[in-house]
Design a protein with these regions (language model features):
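Intracellular juxtamembrane helix-capping segments at the cytosolic ends
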Residues: 77-93, 266-269, 359, 366-381
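Intracellular loop-helix junctions on the cytosolic face of multi-pass helical membrane proteins
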Residues: 92-93, 99, 120-286, 301-302, ...
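C-terminal ends and interior cores of transmembrane alpha-helices
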Residues: 42-64, 323-347
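Hydrophobic alpha-helical transmembrane and interfacial-helix anchor sites in secondary transporters
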Residues: 29-30, 35, 86, 123, ...
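Extracellular/periplasmic helix-loop-helix junction of adjacent transmembrane segments
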Residues: 1-19, 94-100
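Glycine-rich segments within core transmembrane alpha-helices of 12-TM secondary carriers
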Residues: 18-23, 75, 96-147, 184-193, ...
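Conserved MFS/SLC helix-loop-helix module at the cytosolic interface between two early adjacent transmembrane helices
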Residues: 22-46, 51-52
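Helical-face signature of the major facilitator-like transporter fold
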Residues: 68-73, 255-259, 292, 358-363
Length: 462
């Protein structure tokens, strides 16, 4: 049973990595070729096709994985475009409303998630997997049809034409301007090749993601070191745009530990709930419905009560301060589940209702990080890079789930297991406290970087 749970956890986080990797593709084709609306519409149909595959190929492994792949492509591809498309509806005259609308957008997402988390496990057990997978597919098709009907009501910005001063062209110029840039790029490529050579040991997904992180991370450092050398070959506005994006990517990198913790509520926390006492009619996975329900309560509470109260006391709750606190709250939630796991490992059974506390802490962190991060990412992106920067925001989720797979792979090593047991903890409890410490370290680093971060304003002109 433990091996089955571990395998399910690995499949889940691999799927999440795919969902949040494909935004890079979706953001690029939207900004460069098709525009955000067309990308959203056609990839939504791909998503519907993937749901159909899940419904029809429940007992066919190949068909089932094809369905998961199509959903990852469709869902991932539209993610950066939807949030950027929301931002496109605002300009300098009404940008003050953007935060409210982004919060409402996030609230509506969780409204749907509430019903999915609460009802899908019931449909799965009572009606079977084909119906449980088919219902979301039908609803997705209906929403796509509504999007098509309302197409004339939206502000649709055209894709950016080929630009000799694009982000990639400026980066290429900077990297090639001096030996330092070329060395960093070479080290990044070498690290990527080294990661790919580890595919037999780590698996394709982990190795490929590590290769991508190596190229982006080391390449980004090389560009930063040499960006001034691009002056004269590219206009100042293009160089400033690249610098702005690189600054944002540093913050995104520090958010990745939050996603490591957050997405495990659907895997590690569900497995913990299996060991707790609960009514016979209640399934462990239904506990996840608490997350979107709390989001729907916390977003209006924060905007109408908490933030105004803090402002009255002279404390301005900026986006970066909210995100710093959110990462820390996520870490605190994992201290709580870690303590609960220690008690469970000691043989003491207790109610699943105890998970309400860590869910509340994690959800507060989610509202502070995720809902805030969507609006922050959009506001910091130059006009021609809205889709791509939102894709990088989604990529931070991929990397967060990558850390989960890396840690899980690490604890399969006998020497690592021996070290953990010598510490007095069982493996699962040790991992929980490890992830909590990971989040606290990230919150500290994020807060320090945020103190000197120069905010930009890239909303379009009216």
């Amino acid at each position: 049973e433990a091996e089955r749970g571990g395998a399910a956890k690995e499949v889940f986080h691999t799927f999440v990595i795919g969902v949040y990797f494909f935004p890079l593709l979706g953001g690029w084709i939207a900004d460069r070729f098709f525009g955000k609306y067309n990308t959203i519409f056609w990839l939504s149909l791909v998503y519907c096709l993937g749901q159909a595959c899940l419904a029809f190929f429940v007992f066919n492994r190949i068909g089932f994985y094809v369905g998961l792949s199509l959903i990852a492509l469709g869902s991932g591809g539209i993610k950066p475009c939807v949030s950027a498309f929301v931002g496109d509806q605002f300009d300098q005259t009404n940008k003050h409303r953007a935060k409210v609308v982004f919060d409402a957008f996030y609230w509506i997402i969780n409204f749907g998630s509430l019903f999915a988390s609460g009802l899908m496990p019931i449909f799965l057990s009572s009606l079977g997997p084909s119906i449980a997978f088919g219902i979301p597919g039908v609803l997705m098709f209906v929403s796509t049809f509504v999007l098509w009907i309302a197409r004339k009501q939206y502000v649709m910005l055209p894709p950016t034409p080929p630009d000799p001063h694009s982000f990639l062209n400026v980066c290429r110029t900077a990297l090639g301007a001096d030996v330092r840039g070329r060395v960093m790029a070479g080290v990044g490529v070498a690290a990527a090749i080294g990661s790919l050579l580890l595919i037999p040991k780590l698996g394709f997904v982990i190795a490929a993601c590590l290769a991508l992180v190596s190229v982006i991370g080391l390449g980004g450092i090389g560009v930063w070191l040499q960006l001034d050398a691009a002056r004269g070959k590219h206009p100042e506005e293009a160089i400033a745009g690249v610098r702005s994006v690189l600054r944002v990517l540093v913050l995104f990198a520090l958010v990745t530990p939050f996603w490591s913790l957050f997405d495990q509520k659907a895997s590690t926390w569900v497995l913990q709930a299996d060991a707790m006492t609960k009514p016979s009619w209640f399934q462990s996975s239904q506990m996840q419905a608490l997350n979107p329900a709390l989001v729907m309560l916390l977003i209006p509470f924060n905007n109408l009560v908490l933030y105004p109260a803090l402002r009255k006391r002279g404390y301005e709750v900026t986006a970066l301060r909210r995100m710093t606190a959110g990462i820390a709250f996520a870490g605190l939630s994992w201290i709580v589940v870690g303590a609960m796991q220690v008690v469970l490992n000691g043989g003491t059974a207790f109610s699943i209702t105890w998970q309400v506390l860590p869910y509340a802490l994690l959800t507060l962190g989610e509202v502070l990080v995720s809902a805030t991060g969507l609006e922050f990412a959009y506001s910091q992106a130059p006009l021609a890079m809205k889709g791509v920067i939102m894709a990088f925001w989604s990529l931070s989720v991929t990397i967060g789930n990558l850390w989960v797979l890396v840690v899980n792979a690490g604890v399969k090593n006998d020497s690592v297991i021996g070290f953990i047991k010598s510490s007095g903890f069982e493996v699962t409890a040790f991992q929980m406290f490890f992830f909590a410490g990971f989040a606290f370290a990230a919150a500290l680093a994020f807060g320090l970087v945020a103190r000197s971060y120069p905010l930009a304003d890239h909303y379009r002109k009216a």
